Amino acid sequence: MLSFLISCGASPPVTEDLTSSVESTTDPINELFSQAVLLSGNEAFVLKIEAIEKLIENGSLERAQYEIERISVADSFEHKAVLKYLLFNAHIAKVNGQNEAAIQWLDDPLATEIDAASELGRDFLLAKGRTYITLNQPESAILTLAEVTEYWSMDTEITLYEDLWGALQNVNDQQLSVIAEDSTSYELRGWIELARAFNSEETSIKKQLDAIDQWRRTWVRHSAVARLPQPLKDLQSVWQTRPTDIALILPVLQPAGNAIYEGFLSAYYQELLVSQEVPKVSIYDSSNVLSIMELYNQAASGGADLIIGPLKKSFVNELLEKGELPVDTLALNYADSPRSNNNLFQFGLAPQDEIIEVANLAWENGHRTASILMPESGDYQELQEFFEQTWTQKGGRIASKVNFQEGANYADIVKNLVAIDGSELRSEKLLSLLPRRNMEFVPRRRNDIDFIFLVADPDAGRQIKPTLAFYFAENIPVYSIPSIYEGTYNPPDNKDLDGITFVDSPWMLRPGDVQNRPAEDNLRQASGPLQRLRAMGVDSFRLHPRLQQFSSGNITSLRGATGKISINENQVFHRQLEAARFVDGIATLIEK
């Protein structure tokens, strides 16, 4: 009946001349409005709503808006007509780009006793759920859409199940648990358990397929048993068409390449425990290669249906400049150009992702003015500029920025950062002008710094953080990127890092997590940077069968060892990391 509203405003606003619209409207619509003039109360209201429905069906949105704004509603009016009144107002608001106004109409106190078994009730709840999705409120969308699924016709083309599944994939485990605790509905509980089963096996498509089969045997009366969301339906095809011959191009004689190789192999053997149907892997060493194309073509002509690598940025630039590649390729670094090739995917440990995470975290915590403290070199200068750009685009301000060299005098650097040196200069000038020499000087730091963005290794951090405290800056929050953490349990040494908030990968912050084990159990101890490269190797293996899923949009993210991985329109993968803070020398997770 109201199928024209299902999208709830996917079209752009309609501009029309109101006078000509009134004159050209079909006689039945004008007749309804004429009849309504002769009536009052509920009877007039019902006729006007019927006329407005026809206006919207005809695409006459401007007149529909004009007419509906002149209507008064009361809770004593016919419930069905009242729901249409709210739904039509929400539709018009969404068409006009007013999503907040739309949800206010759909959440109106008059919107009570919505019968999901009725066509109007289903349309109303679907519009409401989709509006929540538009407003990035997945929890509310889940609660709303789950009311509808058991009543939804099997032959409808509407993507209700996909909408609900997308919302389920946009909440974390903790949010799912909260929803589950409040749920008394078999339908909603079933959806939650399906999401949990699917998410718990993200490391393996085969294990996900087994988990879905087990869920279907358990939740036999659930609507999704007969109608799985499309991404889950497609999973069997993804498994059957996965790459079976992988060429791995890495500088295995170099520490970075070897660490990635170790991580890749650990994930490979972890998958072997699940299924014997693992891909064939051939290694191509790029340690002494000056140009990648000869080695790349050798790997491609060797029968590979997927190439993972190369690692060197200049090699990735070569591949991008080549244009269309003969084989799907997952490069392990990022090209300088934002351009893309159809079958070139780019994945790595970009520090820009880490900086974005720190900036988001600081902003969410209410900070607006930053000071920057990082090493002095060309590479770090680029990162400093990226942080400044990211922070100022948010509306933040940079109070000061200081660069340091390894082994520098951190006292002078910190005094410069918080303007203690300026306070000392003013004191010296004042003392030189006054005759008395028994004046007591108390240095003061600048008081407009909300937080300090620090880029440093653990050794430098252990000197800088206490120095900040010595110069009256102990209460200024300090945020950092993964370089501040070496990844080992060392409370005595790390005590000097206490209070620093930083972001890092799950591999580093959740070493006992089921997603990482047994992958890391068989690996020797290594430094923090090499551990993160191992995690990258793990994720390169776990990503390899899912590239087309990402490319088609069937999945939008994957919880990996390096973070929550997503992809952009240029087939470049980005990571969302986790936050932690040093407490008593221990890197302690900050749960969101």
Regions found by a protein language model. Give the residues of each.
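Bacterial Sec signal peptide processing site at the extreme N-terminus
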Residues: C8-T26
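Alpha-helical protein-protein interaction scaffolds
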Residues: T25-L232
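Beta-alpha junction/loop-to-helix N-cap segments that form part of ligand/metal-binding clefts
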Residues: Y85, A256-A259, V274-S337
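Periplasmic-binding protein-like
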Residues: A300-K312, L330-L332, T369-P375, E424-P458, ...
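Short beta-strand elements at the ligand-binding edges of bilobed clamshell
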Residues: S337-L361, N494-P506
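An alpha-beta-alpha
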Residues: F347-E406
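Extracellular/periplasmic periplasmic-binding protein-like sensory domains
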Residues: E424-S427, N447-I449, K465-V538
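Segments of small-molecule ligand-sensing domains
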Residues: D521-L589
